[in-house]
């Protein structure tokens, strides 16, 4: 009987069937109908429990693997959003005239005088503008702030368009649209120029105000107004 238990231990399915037959009458033993002793059942169960534990992953291991897989998928996506994450916070510090104080990447008000100390001629740096939109604050060649800001949202599919100082233009990384240094579209697939805002200075702070006048770059009415 011991040899039978050992031979079935390597096959759990067969072992379970053998367990089910224990305790039933056994024919042909020469003493009538007898039953296998209860101790045989105990021995068989012990053999089944001898399967190495490292071959059966427990719940903790499976949960850990699931978390690692989720992290591997999520991290690249998060990494793509981090550079522009500061510009998706709710807008604030507006005034009664519909303007919006420009915010830097840390959420602080942009002070015109301090900004010009750290941003040189022809600089274009993202700030938070009207309705929280990422908006470029422009420094002119004469080291003064331009009276306009440029909305950084591409007019093709809404990607944030980075400034390429080496080529003196805005180049969208999504589909290759290009805009000149004032945000006028010079290459598609974007159909329109980047939107404009007024950039005024009020009490030392840069204030973005909606642009509803003619687009000075094209001579057309502003499509965004």
Swiss-Prot record:
Quote the transit peptide annotation as a residue range: 1-46
Family per record: Belongs to the Rieske iron-sulfur protein family.
Subcellular localization is given as: Plastid, Chloroplast thylakoid membrane
Q: How does it assemble?
A: The 4 large subunits of the cytochrome b6-f complex are cytochrome b6, subunit IV (17 kDa polypeptide, petD), cytochrome f and the Rieske protein, while the 4 small subunits are petG, petL, petM and petN. The complex functions as a dimer.
User: Function of this protein?
Assistant: Component of the cytochrome b6-f complex, which mediates electron transfer between photosystem II (PSII) and photosystem I (PSI), cyclic electron flow around PSI, and state transitions.
Q: Which PROSITE patterns match?
A: RIESKE
Sorted keywords for this record are: 2Fe-2S, Chloroplast, Disulfide bond, Electron transport, Iron, Iron-sulfur, Membrane, Metal-binding, Plastid, Thylakoid, Transit peptide, Translocase, Transmembrane, Transmembrane helix, Transport
Question: Predominant location of this chain?
Answer: plastid
Record-annotated membrane-spanning stretches: 69-89
User: Which cofactors does it use?
Assistant: [2Fe-2S] cluster
Substrates-to-products reaction catalysed: 2 oxidized [plastocyanin] + a plastoquinol + 2 H(+)(in) = 2 reduced [plastocyanin] + a plastoquinone + 4 H(+)(out)
Q: How does it sit in the membrane?
A: Single-pass membrane protein
Provenance organism = Oryza sativa subsp. japonica (Rice)
Which pairs of positions does the record mark as disulfide bonds? Answer: 159-174
Q: What class of enzyme is it?
A: translocase
Looking up InterPro entries in the UniProt record yields: Cyt_b6_f_Rieske, Rieske_2Fe-2S, Rieske_2Fe-2S_sf, Rieske_Fe-S_prot, Rieske_Fe-S_prot_C
Give this protein's Gene Ontology molecular function annotations. Answer: 2 iron, 2 sulfur cluster binding; electron transporter, transferring electrons within cytochrome b6/f complex of photosystem II activity; metal ion binding; oxidoreductase activity; plastoquinol--plastocyanin reductase activity
Gene that produces this protein: petC
SUPFAM superfamilies given in the database record: ISP domain (SSF50022)
The residues that the entry says bind [2Fe-2S] cluster are: 154, 156, 172, 175
Source organism superkingdom: Eukaryota
The beginning of the lineage is:
Eukaryota, Viridiplantae, Streptophyta, Embryophyta, Tracheophyta
Q: What is its EC number?
A: 7.1.1.6
Q: Which GO terms describe its cellular component?
A: chloroplast thylakoid membrane; plasma membrane
Can you name this protein? Answer: Cytochrome b6-f complex iron-sulfur subunit, chloroplastic
Instruction: Tell me where in this chain the Rieske domain is found.
Output: 112-208
